[in-house]
Amino acid sequence: MKFGMSAYCLTPAMEQGRMSVYDVIDFAKAHGCEHIEFVPFSLPFVDPQSSKLNESLCDSVREKCESVGIEISTYSVNADLLKPDIADRGREIERVKRHIDAAARLGLKRMRYDTSSFRRPFETNTVENFYRELPMMIEGIRELHDYTSERKITTTLENHGFFVNGSDRILHLIQSTGFDDIKMTLDVGNFQCVDEDSVAAVKKCLPYAEIIHLKDFYVRKKSALPGQTEMFNCNMGSWFETMGGRMLRGSILGQGDLDIWEILRVVKASGFDGYISLEFEGMEPCEQGTEISLAMARAIWERV
């Protein structure tokens, strides 16, 4: 098992100019991370306007990680394979393929892409709609799976984006692709977005997990936070609403309302031998929150 972090943790520092991606890599190494995960936030591995691969950025990031001795574990990309217009859907698949090219250029063996990131308002996020749109998701995944396979990259799908956050939905999606080599990026916190118990969901999903996203949330009643409700406002430090009408906000690991101790006990007892990647998205300064969260993750792991 390897502990590490997602560069996503330090996105605010990159957006505000306090850190470069190379500083983020140094930070991860200095804080004992065995691996680092990248997301394309403030990191234009693929130009968002032209959709062209930024080969020089990919190469320099890969070389920096090699020079400091830290592994790049995965690359995670939001995507919506359920666009109603066929042409738009085709363009979205081609956009994801460019990110797969970036993953290959970074030297990666695995990559996560979404199928329906934040595109289903709560009133349409139903069981009926899930099964109605399942064939479209599978069609897109199969095309992208062929593309990743040619580059010897393992596809992982995550309980992310609200439409497939529940354990039953994400497992059904993975199983329905027909590919045994499609694995899961298991996010221990994202089950909360659909009001599912994280401990029970983690137990169910662990056999499929290739990589685990470790995070914590504060969980509150909606009535206790008047005026704070906003669908999908998952920015760091923001309250956002769950499917069942509760409110969530990212916290420092171990300081929120998730039972992180029991979650990590379950993971450790399972013999999981993959990657655990911290995702800090609280309102504290990101450098401080990430540092404390990494220390908490190790301290809890050693004690469970």
Sequence positions of predicted segments:
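Boundary/entry segment of secreted carbohydrate-active catalytic domains
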Residues: 1-17
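Conserved, mostly hydrophobic/aromatic
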Residues: 5, 28, 36, 65, ...
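Active-site beta-loop-alpha junctions enriched in small/polar residues
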Residues: 8-12, 39-41, 77-80, 116-118, ...
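Acidic/histidine-rich catalytic cores of soluble enzymes
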Residues: 18, 35-36, 67, 72-75, ...
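Catalytic domains of carbohydrate-active enzymes, especially glycoside hydrolases
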Residues: 20-41, 107
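Active-site acidic/histidine proton-transfer and metal-coordination neighborhood
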Residues: 23-26, 58-71, 82-184, 193
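Glycine-rich, proline-tolerant flexible connector loops at the mouths of alpha/beta enzymes
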Residues: 37-61, 115-121
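C-terminal helical cap(s) of enzyme catalytic domains, especially alpha/beta-barrels
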Residues: 287-304
